[in-house]
């Protein structure tokens, strides 16, 4: 039971496995097999691969693990981190956008809206933690690099 609880606690397991199963099941129960918009399907592997590749990249350059439960040893400012501070979370968001578009579902859109807010709040909390960990060098990085959209936000 402890392993299962830990598995469900993983944000990536919930994003890439649990939510798609739940949303497909709810859509199927409500009205049979949902009509899928296949043109949006590439967003699903894009979001998944972005999360995993950026996580491996950050771990390679910064040490630690892909999440803050095993925090980095160094600030990573190279690659995609030169343009945005939270590309791993953005991978989750791209996946949820893809899921909402593929399913063309109000429920999937509501799940996306919830996660837009949730990941923004989580990123802000992570950034406070990293500022405590790395001090002024991290605060300077935050002044130079936007949270989500390069040069904008």
Model-inferred region functions:
Residues 1-81, 90-153:
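Membrane-anchoring alpha-helices and their flanking helix-loop junctions
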Residues 86:
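Extended, alpha-helix-rich binding/interface surfaces that flank or overlap catalytic cores
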